[in-house]
Each structure stands twice: as C-alpha cells, then as structure tokens.
Amino acid sequence: MTYRSCIPQNDLECYYNPNKTKYKSTNILSSIQHKIDKELTAYITDKTIDDTFGNRMIVFRDSFYDKPKNSKIFRQIIHMIETSNCWYSVKFLMDNGISSLFSLGITPHHTYPKKYYPMIISPILSLESKNDYQDYLALVRLKNFIGYSYDYITKYWNYKLSNKQNFINDVMEMESQLSLVTLTIEQQNNPFVIYNSLKWREFLEKYDVDNFWSSILGSYLKKEDYVIFDNIQYLSYLREYLKNTSKNSIKNYLVYSLVKKFGLYTDLLEFYNDIVIESINHDQIFLNMFSQYFGIYLETVFETRYHDKDKKEYITKMFYDMKLYLRNYFIECKFTDKTKREISLKIDNLHMVIGRQNYQYDLENFPLMGNDFYENVLNLERYYFHESIKLIGSTINKEWFSINGGMYSFEVNAYYDPICNVLYIPTSIINDMTISLERDDVYNYGSIGTILAHEIMHSLDNFGLQVNCDLSIGNKWDISDYKFYLSDLRKIIQHRIKLSNYDIASSIDALSEDISDTLGLKLSFKTYLSKFNKKIEPDNLSTNDKIHLQKFFYSWTETFKNINNNNQDDHSPSYIRINAPLAHLDEFYYLYGVESQHLNYLDPQLRSRILDKIN
C-alpha cells in the first residue's frame, strides 16, 4: 500500500500544495467562538431576563442604545482637565479606568515577596505597530484621525483649551516619541524585559518628577511595597517628557486619551478603521463591551449551560499523563542532575485551572446603572479598578487570572502564565468539536490534547525557560544543557523562517508559539503512544496501526486549519502552523511515507530532537 506524503485533510492548508488557496476552510476554534458570541448576544438582547444582576445589565444595554453625543460627564471631565492640575487629572483618569500616560494593572510579583503589586504599563499606540510610524501614509491617516477627533470633542464635549493644529501636533509628537520606545512583540513576551520591579521609595528616587508618581500612586502604596513595570525605556522617556513638556501639551494628550477610550462608541468609529488593520464593527464593539463590563455575570450564565464535569475529569487526567511523560523524558535524558532537578520541579509545580478561574469580585459593591451610558461605563471602570487595587500586598493565588478583567470561560483562548507556572483551559474550548467522550482517544489527543500540550510546552519554550521552578527569573540550568536546549529550539525557528521565505521579523513575532506548537504536538502524540503501547518504527506497524494513528494528525489539522489568518494573531499563518510541526516528528514520516523528494521533508539533522526517543 502506498501512503500519501501529506496529511489526510485535502491538503488545503499545506504550504507545499499549490492549490492551498483554492478552497475555503473553517477554523474549529473560530467556529466555536462565533457560536458562543451569537448565543451571548441573543441573551444580552433578550427582553425577559428577570434576575437582579441581569436587570442591571439590561439597564446598561438600554443606556448604550440611547447614548447621547453631548454627555454631561464628558463635559465635566474635559473642564477638569482644562482647569485642574495635570497630575490630578491623570489620577482621576486612572481611577476611572482610562489609560493616559500609562496603564495600571495588578500582577503577581515575579520575585520575593510573592505578592500582588501594581504594574505600570506603557501606553498602547494608536497605530497597529511601531513600524507604522515609519510609514508616511499611515502617519497621514493618524493625523486625519486626530483632526476628526478634535472636531468631534470641540462640538460635543465642549473642548476649547487648544486650537486644532496644536492639538494635532501635541498628540502626534507624543505618539511618535512613544513609538520609539514601545516594546517589540518579542520583547513583550520576554520575562527578562517586561518584569522589572523596585521598592516604592526606590522607584520614586529614580523616576519621580515634580511628585508625579507620588501624587498619583502614593495613596495606594507603602514605602516597602514594590512597583512592577514593563518598559524601562518608557519610564525614562516619560521622566524627560514630564520635565520638558508644557502642561497644555500634556493636557491635549490626556484629552486624546479620552478619545482612545470612548471614541469607539461614537461617530468616530468610522474613522478608526482608517488606522487599524482589522476592521472594527458595531457587533464586535457591542459584545466586547458586555464581556468587559458584565463578563462575571455572563460567565455564570455560560457555565450553567456548558459546564461538563466528565470532560473536565478527562482533560485533567490527560494533563497529569502529559506531565508524567514529560518528567520521565527529562529524567532519562543526558542532562546534568542540576538541570534535571530544575526541570522536574518545574513540571511537578505546573498547575492547571480548567473551566472557569476562581477569582470572585465583591458583587455587593457592584454599581447600580443609570440612564447615561458614559457615566455607567465610568462607574463600572472605577468598580473594577478598586476591586483590583484591594489586592496590593496580598499573597498570590495561582488560580486567579482575571483580576484586571477578562479571561472568562466563554472566551476561546487557552493561556499559560509563566510567573505563576499555571495554565488555563476555559470551558469554551471543552467543546464537542475538540473533545468527545464517545469517540476514540486518538481524536481527542489530536485536538484538545494538542491544545493542552501546547500550553504545557510554553513552560519550556524560549521564554518559559527564563522562569525557574521557584518562579524566579533567570535560567538556573547547567549552562551547557541550557545552550544545547536552545540550539535545538533554534532548529524550529530556522525551519519557520525558511517557510516564511526568510521573513525573519514575521518569524520572531511568532517564535514562542512555533516552539510550543511543535513541542506540544510531539508531547500529545507521544503521550498517546505511551497509552497505545506501540513503538513507532517502519518495520513493526501494521496497516491498521498506521490508519489508526493517522487519525491523530487528521484531528490536529481539523482543529487548526484556516486559510484566512488573522493579521493580529501571534501564531504563524495556519497553513504553516499545521504543517511545520509535523516535519519535526519522525513518526509522521513513518506513517505517511515522507521521503526526501517530498516538499514537507526536513533533513533529520535539521529536526528538533526534544521529546524524541532517548537512545
């Protein structure tokens, strides 16, 4: 019997298939999210919700439908910014969930003490990436957007501090300078870069200007508390910006921050699509808004419908089987005892939260809703901000994910947190399309198993390596083992770069995801093999064995296939994501008869050998 040299799913997404764009295909995970979104939207727009919390959501919904252009609350905020001390205005915006010169979140401290502390996050650019600020046409579109914003806020929000040209110039100057110090995608994922901390008193000595930080954060921190920050360059830039920039110029940027926060809910929406890659529509805004502000309620509704105890138990067992396989592999490998100990402890201490995460808000303080939509939003933002602020100085709970909002179980997004060494598999992914207790295990390992294994292997990807078993940052492996492991990971990246026609920037952006895709596929397949109890060699597999194991790869491709890749996705394009990891799995060659003349062949010397059989 002749076996095909490629995966058995019509080869629609194969990078070696010239017809890969001939047909459309549906991404299962996107389909799941689309179905959930439709159900949640139908629930939100239903007239018959009769519980107390749901009624608040309905009042909020109706205020959205009837939102005014001339909201009194905006005129008050604008007047405050125009007439008050700049630092007071920044604090007011922060307390009401509006990012201006920085954002503030609460996050686990990455070193001793293991407590929650505030994290200062540099502002998000208006354009999609820092590279866009080198594009003349993109800058023209941004200037036009700022101009439209000025026209809107002078007409409806009673803004009158500055003329139009000065407003545009001040905002463009801040945006352009900010683009120079904004982190790259690779840096944003690197623990060495984004996890920095100082004691509060030390932070003030280094970065405070004219009591800026002390007046804004001082009421929340004691001198021995820590401040975490993601971008040292930005803090240095901000220090100079505050020293040398006129207060009116700063105020112009604060007003623009209001536009960035609320413009999506106004007539400015049509102009947003001039400065973003992915078009924004009213349906997205509507559902994202309710997820953000009423996610705690919608999650309860969702869990009531879709919580599946048996599937959770199945995945939990799969998780421990994968951890056992992974641990045994590294115990048997040729690393030093020091490295083996570090890896073993990290795997042992790897935890999973499945279904919904356990952080609960104090709903007794949840605000009542009124008729003014924008006032409702500010009340909600203030509520969530102060709920998170209460955690400062408290001990880390590894099962809490959404202390800054988000990470709800109805969002199709598995996640690994390197600082707590814990992964999250939401209820949304525990779907009949990814796991069925009625079908052969091989399909489940090819689908939900690869998702789970992908997140597990983030703990040992290029960034996960930087966090040790004690959750400190800075790899503690034996140096020779560390270099050997990294050299093997580079094989995955070099392969990815080749498939991207040597577009190195594109590959670097997806670097950790490519590693976790490849090693996750290996881990799931080899864990399944340990249950299947067969050694994969060309001469000891029957035809039935091959047909059976091919189901794993069929399930893998059915889960991730998608031609129309999202430009904002951190992962590789789907036609690469599906196929590239297979080239590093020797068993794939045996099962499909892949030989050197085939385009999906990779020389054995160029394949990653992590998780391969130890001779």
Curated annotation (Swiss-Prot):
Keyword Nucleotide-binding: no
Cofactor remark: Binds 1 zinc ion per subunit.
Induction comment from the UniProt entry of this chain: Expressed in the late phase of the viral replicative cycle (between 6 and 9 hpi).
The Peptidase M13 domain, residue ranges: 1-611
Molecular function terms from GO: metal ion binding; metalloendopeptidase activity; metallopeptidase activity
Keyword tags: Hydrolase, Metal-binding, Metalloprotease, Protease, Zinc
A GO CC annotation given for this chain: plasma membrane
Name this protein carries in UniProt: Zinc metalloproteinase R519
Classification of source organism: Viruses, Varidnaviria, Bamfordvirae, Nucleocytoviricota, Megaviricetes
